[in-house]
């Protein structure tokens, strides 16, 4: 099946636009995640893709074929897509085999062919030998695999997944992430995945679409979205970030921003002028802390305000001379003590500047 093309999609519920002017292209065989907070429109987009909803404007195409528009919607059963729901939606009175074979039964696939396909997909998801068990005899992770197998057995070109891991405990959720990604690679099916979990999106995806209030804010590989956020909203949503207020001292690609009265060398986007207020974004893991200053622009005197051991890293809260707070995280930070005077380095390569 060819790629997905979504063009200027609009879906309203009364006066509220759940999805507004949303456009996206997904390549064949790609794993794309729709990421955003509750109410951002990601599940609505998934339901529009599935054919459960009709758009008020815009078009959804797969391989050049129009599947959805205000004029009409191709029924879900004719789209060549599978869907895995958050709640698993497995029938408790049917065995694993009967749950997985349901779509084949509806399609009147011959019994011998159905048995072959069910056996193959159960092996694929790690449920071989459990055909005769009922859902009540399975763990949560196994029930989720039943839901996956049921969607895969009909051999869809596209698989839609609506927060399928949210009901699992943390350790099982982490293991299932790897299994999902491995499954997608082995099958070559295009996965469109919905979640509000940033770590999940980064672990699974070839590309991430970050949504807010029904609009697309940024679309790209996980590393780009995390390290080079397109806006303050994306930077804040994608994980812990320091947002430091400053003013442009010298515009340009080799610019300087004054933060807490000290010069910080950083590349500035076009359009910023001298004296303009800005915010400098940097992740805690990219903040350097040392007992001595190295003399470069980008070093800020600070005091260690708080230290918290988090297991793999130490979380360090720092107070700059003007009272501004920022955080650093790293393995070596447990060598410092609360109240100690230190020097903070903001590496220009890891800084992103947003206009005020």
Features from the language model and the residues they span:
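ABC ATPase nucleotide-binding domains
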Residues: 76, 80-82, 86, 90-233
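Pre-Walker A (P-loop) beta-loop-beta motif of ABC nucleotide-binding domains
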Residues: 22-33
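Helix-to-loop junction immediately C-terminal to a conserved catalytic motif
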Residues: 50
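Conserved ABC transporter NBD signature motif
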Residues: 58-69
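The feature captures the beta-strand-to-loop junction immediately N-terminal to the Walker
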Residues: 35-37
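ABC ATPase nucleotide-binding domain
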Residues: 5, 25, 61, 343-345
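Glycine/charge-rich catalytic "coupling/switch" loops of P-loop NTPases
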Residues: 227, 256, 260-307, 334-356
């Amino acid at each position: 099946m060819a790629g997905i093309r979504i063009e200027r999609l609009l879906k309203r519920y009364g006066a509220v636009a759940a999805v507004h002017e949303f456009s996206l292209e997904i390549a064949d065989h790609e794993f794309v995640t729709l990421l955003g907070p509750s109410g951002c429109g990601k599940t609505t987009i998934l339901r529009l893709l599935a054919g459960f909803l009709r758009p008020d404007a815009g078009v959804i195409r797969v391989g050049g074929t129009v599947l959805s528009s205000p004029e009409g919607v191709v029924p879900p059963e004719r789209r060549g897509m599978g869907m895995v729901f958050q709640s698993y939606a497995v029938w408790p009175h049917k065995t694993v085999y009967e749950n997985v074979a349901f779509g084949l039964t509806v399609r009147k696939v011959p019994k011998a062919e159905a048995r072959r396909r069910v056996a193959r997909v159960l092996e694929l998801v790690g449920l071989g030998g459990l055909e005769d068990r009922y859902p009540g005899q399975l763990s949560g992770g196994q029930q989720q695999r039943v839901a996956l197998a049921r969607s895969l057995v009909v051999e869809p070109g596209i698989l839609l997944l609506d927060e399928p891991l949210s009901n699992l405990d943390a350790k099982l959720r982490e293991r299932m992430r790897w299994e999902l990604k491995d499954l997608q690679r082995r099958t070559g099916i295009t996965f469109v995945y919905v979640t509000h979990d940033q770590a999940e999106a980064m672990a699974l995806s070839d590309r991430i679409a970050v949504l807010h209030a029904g609009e697309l804010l940024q679309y790209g590989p996980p590393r780009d979205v995390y390290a080079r956020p397109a806006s303050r909203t994306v930077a804040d949503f994608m994980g812990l970030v320091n947002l430091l207020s400053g003013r442009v001292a010298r515009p340009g690609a080799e610019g300087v921003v004054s933060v807490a009265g000290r010069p910080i060398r950083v590349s500035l986007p076009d359009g910023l002028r001298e004296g303009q207020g800005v915010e400098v974004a940097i992740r805690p893991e990219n903040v350097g802390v040392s007992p001595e200053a190295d003399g470069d622009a980008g070093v800020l005197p600070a005091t260690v305000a708080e230290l918290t051991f988090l297991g793999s890293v130490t979380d360090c809260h720092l107070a700059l001379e003007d009272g501004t707070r920022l955080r650093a995280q790293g393995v070596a930070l447990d060598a410092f003590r609360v109240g100690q005077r230190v020097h903070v380095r903001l590496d220009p390569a890891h800084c992103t500047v947003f206009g005020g």
